[in-house]
């Protein structure tokens, strides 16, 4: 009789442990999935009217990146920016300005993708006229001085040059600018 009672007690005790383990496992899974849903829905941080500067080794300005609104999503390794402005400097003088409606910062700033009504303006110098580039998407690799696009582009250079094409690559290190496809050039001879 005693062995039956102890065997029953052991089985009952094992059953209670199994039920509580199952219950706790389900609670942990449910809590983990609800935390995961909270993480994916909200940004890790949020900034308004921000400005970020990067300098060269000698301390001179390389570029300033600013915008109206920045949201960073850790789970996607991406930062979204509204109305970004990218100012490039040469010898501490503003060389070019790029504006758009949206941008994605990828890999902690190694790549910036400007989207929606992108306008690049290269300011005039003593040897060059003002140049404007229009596209729907522009990829900037600020650490490599490399800019590219796979979208249709339009370049307008003073006084009367207009270039259209699809896709472009600008590599400052190699000092090359290539339009990839469907290039058309319109040139109007200046009036004297």
Per-range role (PLM):
Residues 1-192:
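Mature-chain termini and adjacent capping regions
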């Amino acid at each position: 009789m005693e062995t039956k009672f102890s065997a029953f007690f052991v089985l009952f005790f094992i059953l209670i442990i199994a039920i509580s383990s199952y219950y706790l496992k389900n609670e942990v899974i449910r809590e983990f999935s609800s935390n995961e849903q909270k993480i994916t829905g909200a940004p890790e941080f949020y900034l308004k009217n921000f400005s970020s500067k990067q300098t060269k080794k000698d301390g001179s300005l390389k570029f300033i990146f600013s915008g109206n609104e920045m949201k960073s999503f850790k789970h996607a390794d991406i930062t979204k920016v509204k109305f970004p402005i990218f100012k490039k400097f040469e010898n501490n003088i503003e060389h070019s300005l790029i504006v758009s409606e949206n941008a994605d910062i990828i890999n902690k700033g190694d790549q910036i993708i400007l989207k929606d009504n992108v306008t690049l303006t290269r300011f005039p110098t003593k040897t060059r006229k003002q140049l404007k580039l229009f596209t729907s998407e522009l990829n900037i690799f600020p650490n490599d001085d490399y800019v590219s696009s796979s979208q249709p582009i339009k370049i307008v250079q003073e006084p009367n040059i207009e270039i259209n094409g699809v896709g472009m690559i600008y590599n400052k290190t190699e000092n090359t600018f290539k339009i990839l496809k469907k290039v058309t050039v319109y040139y109007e001879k200046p009036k004297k």
